[in-house]
């Protein structure tokens, strides 16, 4: 059977181990070819190929439900659930999503993008099943670092107190999340993974028993059971901790041995109550380059399969915002031992790995534990340290109560640096950084700022480090800067709450925030081609907003447009409208941003075009709204 013929996972039933191994080979081949061509998550999926095939062969997927954590480890799942022929569209507009979506496929039982959600969701399904008197299996596959998240541990705590609720948790233990796992839980799991002596004993047990006089051949049929028993005996002390939590423990099992996996899953399915199957896997399995560099090949841009190297850009690009941030923070930290960089398992993505390498004592990785990261930072601030929480905008949502309760109510000087703010592209709605302006703006005792370019980011970083009158947050986008000239050091802080005028005009006031300032200037240039002169403001701060600058100009000019890369509801444009009303300036305002919709996976350029955020689209919209007679004469295209 060829992988392309599998449209339903139940087609795996009855296949021999050798046939499954061939399917596994084809999955890895398709997986590698696709990611090499279009980019995406590489290592996680390669590590769970055998796990997926073995698990699905022991389930009836017409009834049973499997909930995958995070989602980027579920590419093999996608390939055996009817998406083989469309898999080449992975992470592309209108193509297969990079994560799990209930709307995409009947076998995607729960959407996943953020970590540590699977056990809670699967337990909820199991409880609903029992309440309705139905019978089917509920399985949560968690791993790639997600077990370090507090939510997963809360779910384990709950499930362990439900001895009559059948729930299977499959732990994909590859010793990694995106970066190497940290913390006591990771150390514990490493102890549970088979040690070399135990592995040697079980691997050689069968050969030794064959040489026993009279008994060798007769014991051979029981050998696998005996080997399993010896493994369980070897890990009984550490595995007992899981059983103390109320789970029946199976493992650890070799995550790339199909026979062992199938046998273990069958045994675990017979158990009553919550069970945990501990599967030891290798991230990037089957692609030697990814196995050697598991951090670097967690996700990849399009690359050459033969060398593993990313294809070079067609033209030189400016450094990314993340890279500029990392360099500036490390430079500042070298001269200020109170600066501490904090990441929640995203050292490489945020650039904090540079700080880790240079100043390891001023670096903390808490694992996938955003709530803990924020309150840890609050504690550091209490003792006079300067904590810098570098985190993706979408992940800070997970620590909202801690921002309010532990930081802002106590007016503690914690500096939040929000990477991937705005449209992020192919990762889709679970990772778009749309909401931070709105959800942070309403909290007292926090300052919000966003740089117009990478050079201004350097100055804002100094501003945030020096600000001590409460919390402060800086948002910045994914990807390259605009090519603004950078200084190596000597950056000057910005005055809090003050914007700047970048261009003067008489017909309309254009106010940009953050990465949209560059587009705002482009809009002004397009409007000028039609005889419309615009004043352009770089707001810099949304809280406090520079009302002293904005209100008089809005009153004088009489027409206003705002530009942001985030949700309109409660966002920057809303802040401007509120400020104008507070100053009794009643003028028409046109807001540009993301409406009350989710932004699906596509390139950033495609997403901006889909939401009317290209400079040409915005200029045309302004002309239609404020200068209708002029707009009717000509049109502008890009």
UniProtKB/Swiss-Prot annotation:
A GO BP entry is: thiamine biosynthetic process
Task: Tell me which UniProt keywords the record has, alphabetically.
Answer: Isoprene biosynthesis, Magnesium, Metal-binding, Thiamine biosynthesis, Thiamine pyrophosphate, Transferase
Metabolic or biological pathway: Metabolic intermediate biosynthesis; 1-deoxy-D-xylulose 5-phosphate biosynthesis; 1-deoxy-D-xylulose 5-phosphate from D-glyceraldehyde 3-phosphate and pyruvate: step 1/1
Q: What does this protein do?
A: Catalyzes the acyloin condensation reaction between C atoms 2 and 3 of pyruvate and glyceraldehyde 3-phosphate to yield 1-deoxy-D-xylulose-5-phosphate (DXP).
Supply the name of the protein. Answer: 1-deoxy-D-xylulose-5-phosphate synthase
Q: Name one Pfam family in it.
A: Transket_pyr
Q: Name one GO cellular component term.
A: cytosol
**Which species is this record about?**
Picosynechococcus sp. (strain ATCC 27264 / PCC 7002 / PR-6)
| E.C. designation(s) | 2.2.1.7
Alphabetized HAMAP family for the sequence: DXP_synth
Residues in the signal sequence: none
Entry similarity comment = Belongs to the transketolase family. DXPS subfamily.
Task: Please name the GO terms that the record assigns under molecular function.
Answer: 1-deoxy-D-xylulose-5-phosphate synthase activity; magnesium ion binding; thiamine pyrophosphate binding
User: Subunit arrangement?
Assistant: Homodimer.
* Keyword Magnesium listed: yes
- Which parts of the sequence bind Mg(2+)? 144, 174
Its UniProt entry gives the catalysed reaction(s) as:
D-glyceraldehyde 3-phosphate + pyruvate + H(+) = 1-deoxy-D-xylulose 5-phosphate + CO2
Q: Name any cofactors this protein relies on.
A: Mg(2+); thiamine diphosphate
Q: Tell me the InterPro entries matching this sequence.
A: Dxylulose-5-P_synthase, THDP-binding, Transketo_C/PFOR_II, Transketolase-like_Pyr-bd, Transketolase_BS, Transketolase_C, Transketolase_CS
How is its cofactor bound, per UniProt? Binds 1 Mg(2+) ion per subunit. Binds 1 thiamine pyrophosphate per subunit.
- Sites binding thiamine diphosphate sit at 72, 113-115, 145-146, 174, 287, 370
User: What Gene3D superfamilies does this protein's entry cite?
Assistant: 3.40.50.920, 3.40.50.970
């Amino acid at each position: 059977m060829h992988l392309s013929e599998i449209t339903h996972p139940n087609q795996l039933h009855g296949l021999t181990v050798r046939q499954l191994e061939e399917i596994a080979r084809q999955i890895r081949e398709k997986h590698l070819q696709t990611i090499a061509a279009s980019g995406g998550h590489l290592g996680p999926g390669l590590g769970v190929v055998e796990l997926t095939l073995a698990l699905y062969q022991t389930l009836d997927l017409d009834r049973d439900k499997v909930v995958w954590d995070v989602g980027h480890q579920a590419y093999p799942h996608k390939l055996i659930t009817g998406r083989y022929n469309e898999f080449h569209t992975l992470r592309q507009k209108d193509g297969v999503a990079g994560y799990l979506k209930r709307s995409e496929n009947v076998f995607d039982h729960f959407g996943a993008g953020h970590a540590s959600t699977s056990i809670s969701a699967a337990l909820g399904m199991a409880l609903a099943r029992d309440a309705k008197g139905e019978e089917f299996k509920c399985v949560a596959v968690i791993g790639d670092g997600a077990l370090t998240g507090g939510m997963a541990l809360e779910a384990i705590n709950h499930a362990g107190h439900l001895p009559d609720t059948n729930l299977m948790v499959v732990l994909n233990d590859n010793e990694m999340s995106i970066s190497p796992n940290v913390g006591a839980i990771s150390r514990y799991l490493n102890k549970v993974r088979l040690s070399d002596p135990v592995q040697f004993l079980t691997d050689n047990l069968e050969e030794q028993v064959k040489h026993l006089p009279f008994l060798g051949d007769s014991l051979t049929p029981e050998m696998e059971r005996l080997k399993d028993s010896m493994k369980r005996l070897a890990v009984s002390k550490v595995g007992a901790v899981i059983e103390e939590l109320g789970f029946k423990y199976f493992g650890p099992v070799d995550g790339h041995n199909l026979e062992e996996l199938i046998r273990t899953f069958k045994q675990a399915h017979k158990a009553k109550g919550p069970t945990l199957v501990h599967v030891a896997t290798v991230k990037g399995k089957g692609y030697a380059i990814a196995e050697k560099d598991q951090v670097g090949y967690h996700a990849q841009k399009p690359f050459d399969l033969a060398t593993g190297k990313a294809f070079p850009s067609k033209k030189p690009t400016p450094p990314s915002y993340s890279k500029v941030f990392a360099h500036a923070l490390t430079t500042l930290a070298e001269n200020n031992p109170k600066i501490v960089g904090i990441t929640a398992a995203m050292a490489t993505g945020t650039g904090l790995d540079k700080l880790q390498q240079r100043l390891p004592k001023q670096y903390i990785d808490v694992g996938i534990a955003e709530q803990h990261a924020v309150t840890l930072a609050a504690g550091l601030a209490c003792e006079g340290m300067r904590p810098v929480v570098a985190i993706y905008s979408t992940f800070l949502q997970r620590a909202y109560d801690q921002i309010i309760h532990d930081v802002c109510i106590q007016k503690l000087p914690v500096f939040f640096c929000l990477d991937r703010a705005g449209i992020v592209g192919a990762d889709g709605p679970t990772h778009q950084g749309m909401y931070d302006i709105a959800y942070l703006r309403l909290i007292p005792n926090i300052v919000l700022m966003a740089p117009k370019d990478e050079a201004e980011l350097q100055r804002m970083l100094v501003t945030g480090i020096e600000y001590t009158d409460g919390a402060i947050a800086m948002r910045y986008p994914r990807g390259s800067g605009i090519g603004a000239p950078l200084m190596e050091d000597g950056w000057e802080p910005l005055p809090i709450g003050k914007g700047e005028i970048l261009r003067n005009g008489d017909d309309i006031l254009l106010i940009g925030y953050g990465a949209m300032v560059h587009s705002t200037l482009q809009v002004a240039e397009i409007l000028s081609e039609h005889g419309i002169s615009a004043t352009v403001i770089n707001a810099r701060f949304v809280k406090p907003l520079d009302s002293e600058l904005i209100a008089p100009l809005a009153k004088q000019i009489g027409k206003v447009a705002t530009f942001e890369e985030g949700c309109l509801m409660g966002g920057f444009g809303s802040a401007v409208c509120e400020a104008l009303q507070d100053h009794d300036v009643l003028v028409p305002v046109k807001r540009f941003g993301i409406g009350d919709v989710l932004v699906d996976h596509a390139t950033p350029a495609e997403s901006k075009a889909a939401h009317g955020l290209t400079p040409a689209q915005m200029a045309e919209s302004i002309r239609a709204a404020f200068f209708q007679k002029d707009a009717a004469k000509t049109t502008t295209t890009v």
